[in-house]
Structure formats: structure tokens, C-alpha cells
UniProtKB/Swiss-Prot annotation:
Pathway: Isoprenoid biosynthesis; isopentenyl diphosphate biosynthesis via DXP pathway; isopentenyl diphosphate from 1-deoxy-D-xylulose 5-phosphate: step 3/6. Catalyzes the phosphorylation of the position 2 hydroxy group of 4-diphosphocytidyl-2C-methyl-D-erythritol. The active site is at 11, 153. ATP binds at residues 113-123. InterPro entries: GHMP_kinase_C_dom, GHMP_kinase_C_sf, GHMP_kinase_N_dom, IspE, Ribosomal_Su5_D2-typ_SF, Ribsml_uS5_D2-typ_fold_subgr. The keyword Transferase applies. Belongs to the GHMP kinase family. IspE subfamily. Its EC number is 2.7.1.148. Transmembrane segments: none annotated. It comes from Leptospira biflexa serovar Patoc (strain Patoc 1 / ATCC 23582 / Paris). This is 4-diphosphocytidyl-2-C-methyl-D-erythritol kinase. GO terms for molecular function: 4-(cytidine 5'-diphospho)-2-C-methyl-D-erythritol kinase activity; ATP binding.
Length: 306
């Protein structure tokens, strides 16, 4: 038996551009994905079963989410319809590839919010796959494609480095990033990824239809290396922000609030609704936390670093 204690980390997006809609109906992206030290603690137990026994999945969870998100997770937990949980779906899809019958038990402390743009479900699935792929014969390339079939962000969570990400999220180039200290805001409302992408109304183009953000320029790479966030602020923007701010004006006020509290970079993460601010030092970040918490009492705030 193998017993693993791990954390499914959230990610933030530093810049997010969607240059075009692909012929397969999915959207091409350009973004820097960064794993942060806020996540869901997970315990994974893997046990071999005797021949003739079918592989099985056991799931237990503690729900730490607030507001409507608490109900969303309950609905797909062992207290609701577990067949709709991303981890259950991941297990059953991977089960035919196991080289032996396995019993997989997962226990999770759920903190990462759905509809937040920080990879709440994708992170859980990615961590589970990391530990189950060794029980298959899938090559690295096949693992990436399998993870992609679970969700566009899932391949990123098979590894732990910040990456420049293209494709629909499966093409990753590791990059070196300066240490950063931030505050993550979790609003009491979510933004549907599907609705946000639909609102972009991107035209259908062939894969070679845009050269924008095809690669990071030397000045952007240097700025990410040294942490020149002021330089990056107006150069790595999230294309979803305009739509998010129109849909939920409080998010625009929140971004301004981060800057007024001393942040040197602030952005929506993914398609939202989570928004974050990055501060010059850990001390400045800690000083800002009570200020933004007081100004936005309905928000949940989490400090993070990377």
C-alpha cells in the first residue's frame, strides 16, 4: 500500500490573451501560469487488489468553502452525486489503463473555489493523475493528452513550475520567476468559464492566424526573472478583465483597492472571478491584508507566495 500526503496547489495567470478560436471550437490561449502555495490538502492511498477484483475509488471530503460554492461542492461530493466529481470522472477514465486492479482512496480538504479561475478542480485532477500514471504504461506525451481530455488546465498541474502556456493549456514552456508575495481575493460570486469565453466572440481562425504572444519577448522574460511587476502591469494583461468588470463592477473596484493598498501588480486570474494583487515585499503584503479586508468585507482573502 502507498500512502501520499500532498497539496493540490492553485494557479494564477499573469496575463491571459485569447488570440483566436480554433477550428475544433476551442480557444487558443497565451498566458503565464504560476502555481501558488494555497491549495487543497489531499491524502491519496493506493492499494493493489487481488486478481479478479475490479478497481474501485473511495472519496471522502471536508468542505471548507463558503456561500454558494459550499453547495456547489456538496452537490458533487460523497454527500451528493459523486459521479459528477472531477476526481471520480478522472479515475473511471484512467481505470482501463491500470496494469493491475487498484483501490484508490482520496481524502481532500476543500478550500479552492470553483468558478474562481485558479484551477480548483483541475488542480485536484492533476495531482491524482500524477500519482496514478505510474500504474499505467502511458508515455509522457500520452499522459499530457489524457490530462487534456479531463480539462484544458489539467496538464499544467502534472508539474510544479511556472510556465508560459499556449495551445488550449497543454503546451508548456517552464520559466524562471522571481519570488512574489500576493493576496488572493475570492468573491462571493463566480464567473462561468463557458459564458466568459462566449462573451469574447473570437472569430474562427486557422492555427497560424495570429502571431501575437507566440513567444515571450526578451524584455518580458527578464522582467519575470527579476520581478519587475510595474513594467509587466501594462504588458501582460488579462483579456477577460473588461468582460468581468462589466459583469461584476465590484471586481474593478477591487483591483483599484489592491493598488491603493500598495500592490505593484494586480489582475483577474483566468476567466475569474478570483482577483489578486502582488506586493513588493512580504511585509508590505501583510500590512495590506487588513486594509483590503476592511474595505471589502464580503470578500474572502488569502495570502500566498510563489
Amino acid at each position: 500500500m502507498v500512502l501520499l500526503q500532498t497539496i493540490a496547489h492553485a494557479k494564477i495567470n499573469i496575463g491571459l490573451m485569447i488570440p483566436y478560436k480554433r477550428e475544433d471550437g476551442l480557444h487558443e490561449i497565451r498566458s503565464v501560469f504560476v502555481p501558488i502555495d494555497f491549495g487543497d490538502p489531499m491524502e491519496i492511498q493506493i492499494k493493489s487488489l487481488p486478481k479478479g477484483i475490479v478497481s474501485r475509488f473511495v472519496f471522502h471530503s471536508t468542505n471548507h468553502l463558503q456561500g454558494y460554492r459550499h453547495s456547489l461542492f456538496e452537490a458533487v461530493s460523497e454527500r451528493g452525486d459523486l459521479s459528477q466529481n472531477i476526481l471520480t470522472k478522472t479515475f473511471h477514465k484512467l481505470k482501463p489503463y491500470f496494469q493491475e486492479a487498484l483501490e484508490i482512496k482520496v481524502q481532500i480538504q476543500k478550500h479552492l473555489p470553483p468558478e474562481g479561475g485558479i484551477g480548483g478542480g483541475s488542480s485536484n485532477a492533476g495531482v491524482l493523475l500524477q500519482h496514478l500514471f505510474p500504474y499505467t504504461n502511458l508515455s509522457r506525451g500520452e499522459q499530457i493528452q489524457f490530462a487534456k481530455s479531463i480539462g484544458a488546465d489539467v496538464p499544467f498541474f502534472l508539474q510544479s513550475s511556472a510556465c508560459f502556456v499556449t495551445g488550449i493549456g497543454e503546451v508548456m514552456e517552464p520559466i524562471r520567476l522571481a519570488k512574489g508575495f500576493g493576496i488572493l481575493a475570492i468573491p462571493p460570486f463566480g464567473l462561468s468559464t463557458g459564458s466568459m469565453y462566449a462573451s469574447l466572440q473570437k472569430s474562427l481562425q486557422k492555427p497560424y492566424g495570429s502571431e501575437v504572444w507566440k513567444s515571450l519577448t526578451e524584455d518580458l522574460i527578464r522582467s519575470l526573472h527579476v520581478g519587475d511587476w510595474v513594467y509587466l502591469q501594462n504588458r501582460l494583461e488579462n483579456e477577460f478583465e473588461k468582460i468581468a468588470f462589466q459583469t461584476q463592477p465590484l471586481l474593478k473596484e477591487l483591483k483599484l483597492g489592491f493598488f491603493e493598498s500598495g500592490a505593484i501588480f494586480a489582475s483577474l486570474s483566468g476567466s475569474g472571478s478570483c482577483l489578486y494583487g502582488i506586493y513588493p515585499t512580504e511585509e508590505k503584503r501583510n500590512e495590506a491584508l487588513p486594509n483590503v479586508s476592511l474595505r471589502f468585507p464580503k470578500m474572502e482573502f488569502r495570502t500566498f507566495s510563489f
